[in-house]
Amino acid sequence: MTQLTMKDKIGYGLGDTACGFVWQATMFLLAYFYTDVFGLSAGIMGTLFLVSRVLDAVTDPLMGLLVDRTRTRHGQFRPFLLWGAIPFGIVCVLTFYTPDFSAQGKIIYACVTYILLTLVYTFVNVPYCAMPGVITADPKERHALQSWRFFLAAAGSLAISGIALPLVSIIGKGDEQVGYFGAMCVLGLSGVVLLYVCFFTTKERYTFEVQPGSSVAKDLKLLLGNSQWRIMCAFKMMATCSNVVRGGATLYFVKYVMDHPELATQFLLYGSLATMFGSLCSSRLLGRFDRVTAFKWIIVAYSLISLLIFVTPAEHIALIFALNILFLFVFNTTTPLQWLMASDVVDYEESRSGRRLDGLVFSTYLFSLKIGLAIGGAVVGWILAYVNYSASSSVQPVEVLTTIKILFCVVPVVLYAGMFIMLSLYKLTDARVEAISRQLIKHRAAQGEAVPDAATAASH
């Protein structure tokens, strides 16, 4: 099997640094931007997140079907990075622009730009996420590739947490509307450049012909009959929902519960560093264990850490910082494993039915992710609206403070319990995955299919 170089790993990972600008901005900044800068109410924001994300999620399987049927001189997946980079940067910037419109006009503008943002993210991210299957066929190399991917994705998070807010202050000079727009201009342009770097440095080493007799209905029916795909999608929906609830509550937690808004940049920065190194250490720390068993134990560990943060008095700032750093390091050792699940399900489906559905599996995985994103974003907005959170109040009532703590610490733990249950039903252990990989390699060799394609690999 192909041994990946550092160029392969870093080149691929930089694509998720670019995607991370949008993902992390949506997770950590957009809720605050919409309520406190743009001027939306929390209730409208929550509804916008839900409706926009559900509409967008429907396009993910359609994108997957398109990817599975795309073959160009640049390969199957890489062309979408080339075509989508510039629209990606433009829409990212427009989402954080505050127009001088009426209240109704602003709502319409927010809906249009947010939907466009999620659509262009889908156009780039679905094929990007599906690429590991044609970069390498080795499960261990895929783990290493995903570790570097999420290390560099966390660099995108670091840019948001460590650079975005200072840029807002520097560019805006007290005007947050100008500041957010200017900061996202810088980050959007950087994202375009990084997507092009990813395009030129990655290689699709394996090619698969479009399989005869395929149809949308047949492909969807196959996946619906795949128990491991169903478990994977339910798992990812809960995992994403937990991330978004916690991430969406982060700035509120620092500003109101800890009562130190000036520490927001440091809180996000240190958390991003922990995220980076947790992802990078994943294959080294967990590679020696069965991935499913290790994942379950890690869920227990970070659930306990989250509950410790909940019971820690707000005045113990250093302890909260330390626990948050520990939480994010431990949590993110499992992030590469989440995406390995999708690659494993692709191989499992091929061994089960003979159909290789990289695009459809990863797009439906992203569909689950976006449903989780929609629910999580809506939960934050609706619950804050229910307890009468007001952005104009510098001091929040005790009920609001307690609710923010619950959103940050307790609601995610409930979802972690659901993730644990899903993993208890998941059967694609290391031994099973390696056996499937060997089986597929023998079958392809016998059929003369999917051998490394030097011409395709060299096509940049």
Swiss-Prot record:
Which parts pass through the membrane? 10-30, 31-51, 79-99, 107-127, 151-171, 180-200, 263-283, 309-329, 367-387, 406-426
Superkingdom assignment: Bacteria
This entry carries the following GO cellular component terms, namely:
plasma membrane
Major place of residence: membrane
Identify its membrane topology class.
Multi-pass membrane protein
The entry lists its GO molecular-function terms as: symporter activity
UniProt keywords (A-Z) are: Cell inner membrane, Cell membrane, Membrane, Symport, Transmembrane, Transmembrane helix, Transport
Topology, Periplasmic side: 100-106, 172-179, 284-308, 388-405
Q: Does the keyword Flavoprotein apply?
A: no
**Subcellular location as annotated:** Cell inner membrane
User: Which InterPro entries is this protein grouped with?
Assistant: MFS_2, MFS_trans_sf, Na/Gal_symport, Na/Gal_symport_CS
Q: Which residues lie on this side of the membrane: Cytoplasmic?
A: 1-9, 52-78, 128-150, 201-262, 330-366, 427-460
User: Which Gene Ontology terms describe the biological processes this protein takes part in?
Assistant: carbohydrate transport; sodium ion transport; transmembrane transport
Instruction: Cite the NCBIfam families for this sequence.
Output: gph, PRK09669.1
The record's similarity note reads: Belongs to the sodium:galactoside symporter (TC 2.A.2) family.
Return the protein name.
Putative glycoside/cation symporter YagG
**Which organism does this sequence originate in?**
Escherichia coli (strain K12)
Protein's gene: yagG
